[in-house]
Amino acid sequence: MSTTDRELRVGMVGYAFMGAAHSQAWRTVNRVFDLPARARMALICGRDTAKVADAAGRLGWDAHTTDWRELVASDDIDVVDVCTPGDSHAEIALAALAAGKHVLCEKPLANTISEARAMAAAAVTAQAAGVRSMCGFNYRRVPAVAMMRQLVADGRLGVIRHVRATYLQDWIVDPQFPLVWRLQRDRAGSGALGDIGAHIIDLTQYVTGRRITGVSAVTETFVKERPLPAGSSGLAATVDGATVDGLTAADANGADGHCPATGMVTVDDAAVFVARLDGGVLATYEASRFATGRKNALRVEINGSLGTVVFDLERLNELEFYDATRPAAEQGFSRILVTEGEHPYMSAWWPPGHIIGYEHSFTHQARDFIEAVATGVDPAPSFVDGLQVQLVLDAVTRSAELGSSWTEVEPALTTVAA
């Protein structure tokens, strides 16, 4: 429980899936962690007056607006939290930084390299004035992932040789699932690659401390045309009078059996690529929304000369660890239950053995952001880190377009400096 009187007034743009996740975090964080400042959920913004008013009451915000520029310009806002589709990230974040607001922006940082470069450069400039920014890769805040990184940093795996990462979902397997914004390049930037592939790109670079330097990729769009929704919000849509809600597909035909108008899918459904990381590390990545039966299956495995560590999101309170330095008769994968008070973040929660879930990663993200802003430290992942992921996404896209040709990934710091 926070004992400080300092207040950080948060304004959030967007109220759907990520907006709800972030709201839960802002609402909870000071009730769990003792921090040098308190978050106040001051203002939420959305395009639809009735829906944003409902979200404000349901999620716990003091007030609501339909004008994000009003939110950014307000003297009563200290932090701007961007939870919108990728096509508006740059405009909102750049305006917020220019107004002297601290910014938390959902991943991927932007839809294009040029937008991401501008955001990273603006964030670096704003640092001199004490304005902080963070890109929202929430899986870094899973305690088991943070411990995984510590095992690598402590040398428990020896020389890192091989990385393999997958993120698999199946929510658009049905060809009648509607053409929601996540399936349109102008709104989302890319498909499975940017939506979920960005997570495993960031996680592997974070855990190993090594940058992806080159890639060879293939991408595929399995269903190229889909029914047009009458409207959509977050992960829900209305098609010809029928609501398709959450991450499930449903028959999009109307009650009278006719087929609604259709539109073209302009993003990838799946992306697979091999990569090199600094130091010659070999890596493989797969991101797919067509892995039938896989609802939200993220898995990262790191192989080294002295051992292996594995994280599986479906068992997010655990790590698998293989220690090759143990006597041959004792070797084998062991399970580490990451619920001890000594484990990252866990001392604020429950007694050992009592597990946490997906939503806690957002609470931990809010904790780290508040602490960084209140103590004058630059939080991570920074917008430069977000740009580095964007550069990998761009290289993967270009490689796939060029028949899987080997494509180098430039360093983000060089890009920002340029």
Can you annotate each of these PLM segments?
Residues 62-67:
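Conserved SAM-binding strand-loop segment of SAM-dependent methyltransferases
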Residues 79, 85-140, 155:
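Beta-strand-loop-alpha-helix segment that lines the small-molecule cofactor/substrate pocket
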Residues 100, 130, 155, 280, ...:
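Glycine-centered short loops/turns at secondary-structure junctions
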Residues 129-131, 139-265, 319, 403:
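Predominantly a Rossmann-like dinucleotide-binding segment in NAD(P)-dependent oxidoreductases
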Residues 198, 286-295, 354:
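Glycine-rich phosphate/pyrophosphate-binding beta-alpha loops
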Residues 224-268, 272, 276-279, 306-380, ...:
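C-terminal glycine/acidic-rich active-site capping loop/insertion
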